[in-house]
């Protein structure tokens, strides 16, 4: 599914044009209202600067938090406008509302190269309902549309899908284009062998991904809390480890499917156990057939790390989604950190394509200081998963075809 992208438009298309850009500025704030991680803002800079440099008038639309369709003073985009002004080295004005006469007057008064940030689109319930009247009001700010919000592309909302009915061309920004290139490329036409490392605490949240990857991968490695559902399905004692009792049959099915398709499915052979869910719990390493009593598994063990590393060494493309253990506790972060280091090394020294597919694995890689070494780090959580599941993202489908 090839979509028209911003890179195909030059100054003749953009000069003097008002361009509505949907960005993902849903950044974390601390209690003082200060941004604690500006990754998502920085990720949109290439698209914004391209438009500035090509003399467009830039109008940014974004959501922040979950204000439930009403104005919430704590969810205004004021700190985002301030940080964006710093990053761009020019003033970014913020409207009081994303629609209405006052906001439209502000967008109409822009000069070439100016940037205006519309206030939180989710202050209106119509945004998430994909209300076309609301979408038309948003679209009235601009002549054309760029979607650069991969993190919201799996939502059919007014600012991601509805506006494309009223603005043409509607194209992908640089970030969205890069996400599609890596994530779709990895599942549609990867350099093989292709491996997926799937972690996280629950099988239920990764069923779609595992099912879809079984049709595409040569190897799948599973870590995180979900492994105990697989072990219990095999009839093993898992002590007090997390288990989804209603997913035992599903775990059996996934193992059987992998076998039938000739996909190498690797589960840890040893785990790090804890006597309680706490950063300073007592811990011990155990083989998976020797877990008992009040112990719970919180990380994969050293033998499993070696097995996973050896399996990954043969691969040309690796997708990682979800941590190997409770990496927020240093004592149980070894598995996750080892995978992060292994991928960084493979990326740097063996030209392996390493894709970190959103969510907690991104946080883990950043915590380990290895983000720069990966081929691609996805900015979308749910959107990454849905793309890896082979689903069509509404915000992408709505753009003009190339």
Swiss-Prot record:
What's a BP term from Gene Ontology annotated to this protein? gluconeogenesis
- For binding ATP, which residues are annotated in this chain's numbering? 206, 297, 328, 358-361
Which reaction equations make up its catalytic activity? (2R)-3-phosphoglycerate + ATP = (2R)-3-phospho-glyceroyl phosphate + ADP
Which PROSITE patterns does the entry mention?
Answer: PGLYCERATE_KINASE
Record pathway? Carbohydrate degradation; glycolysis; pyruvate from D-glyceraldehyde 3-phosphate: step 2/5
Could you say which residues bind substrate here?
24-26, 40, 63-66, 122, 155
Q: What are its E.C. numbers? A: 2.7.2.3
Report the subcellular localization. Answer: Cytoplasm
**UniProt superkingdom:** Bacteria
The UniProt keywords, alphabetically, are:
ATP-binding, Cytoplasm, Glycolysis, Kinase, Nucleotide-binding, Transferase
Its main subcellular localisation, reduced to a broad class, is: cytoplasm
- Could you list the residue ranges forming a coiled coil in this record? none
What is an example of a GO molecular function annotated in this UniProt entry? ATP binding
Gene Ontology CC terms = cytosol
* Oligomer status and interactors: Monomer.
State the family it belongs to.
Belongs to the phosphoglycerate kinase family.
What protein name does the entry list? Phosphoglycerate kinase
Native organism: Prochlorococcus marinus (strain AS9601)
UniProt lists the gene as pgk
């Amino acid at each position: 599914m090839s979509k028209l992208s911003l890179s195909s438009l030059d100054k003749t298309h953009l000069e003097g044009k008002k361009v509505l850009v949907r960005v993902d500025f849903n950044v974390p704030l601390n209690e003082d209202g200060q941004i604690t991680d500006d990754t998502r803002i920085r990720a949109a800079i290439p698209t914004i600067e391209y438009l500035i440099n090509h003399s467009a008038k830039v109008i940014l639309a974004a959501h922040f938090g979950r204000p439930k369709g009403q104005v919430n003073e704590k969810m205004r985009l004021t700190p985002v406008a301030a940080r964006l002004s710093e990053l761009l080295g020019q003033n970014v004005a913020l409207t009081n509302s994303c629609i209405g006469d006052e906001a439209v007057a502000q967008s109409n008064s822009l000069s070439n190269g100016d940037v205006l940030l519309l206030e939180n689109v989710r202050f209106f319930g119509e945004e998430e309902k994909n209300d076309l009247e609301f979408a038309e009001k948003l679209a009235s700010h601009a002549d054309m549309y760029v979607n650069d919000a991969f993190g919201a592309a799996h939502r059919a909302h007014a600012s991601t899908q509805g506006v494309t009915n009223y603005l043409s061309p509607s194209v992908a920004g640089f970030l969205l284009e890069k996400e599609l290139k890596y994530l779709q490329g990895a599942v549609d036409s990867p350099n093989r062998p292709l491996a997926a490392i799937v972690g996280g605490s629950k099988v239920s949240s990764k069923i779609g991904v595992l099912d879809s990857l079984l049709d595409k991968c040569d190897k799948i490695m599973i870590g995180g809390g979900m492994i105990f559902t697989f072990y219990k399905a095999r009839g093993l004692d898992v002590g007090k480890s997390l288990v989804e009792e209603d997913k035992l049959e599903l775990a059996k099915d996934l193992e059987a499917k992998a076998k039938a398709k000739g996909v190498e499915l690797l589960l840890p052979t040893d785990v790090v156990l804890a006597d309680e869910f706490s950063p300073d719990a007592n811990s011990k390493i155990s083989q998976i057939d020797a877990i008992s009593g009040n112990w719970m598994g919180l990380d994969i063990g050293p033998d499993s790390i070696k097995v996973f590393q050896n399996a990954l060494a043969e691969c040309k493309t690796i997708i990682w989604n979800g941590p190997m253990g409770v990496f927020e506790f240093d004592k149980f972060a070894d598995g996750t950190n080892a995978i992060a280091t292994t991928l960084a090394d493979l990326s740097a020294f063996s030209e392996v394509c390493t894709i970190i597919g959103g969510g907690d694995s991104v946080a883990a890689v950043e915590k380990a200081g290895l983000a720069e070494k990966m081929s691609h780090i996805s900015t979308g959580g749910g959107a990454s998963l849905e793309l890896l599941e082979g689903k069509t993202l509404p915000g992408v489908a709505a753009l003009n075809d190339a």
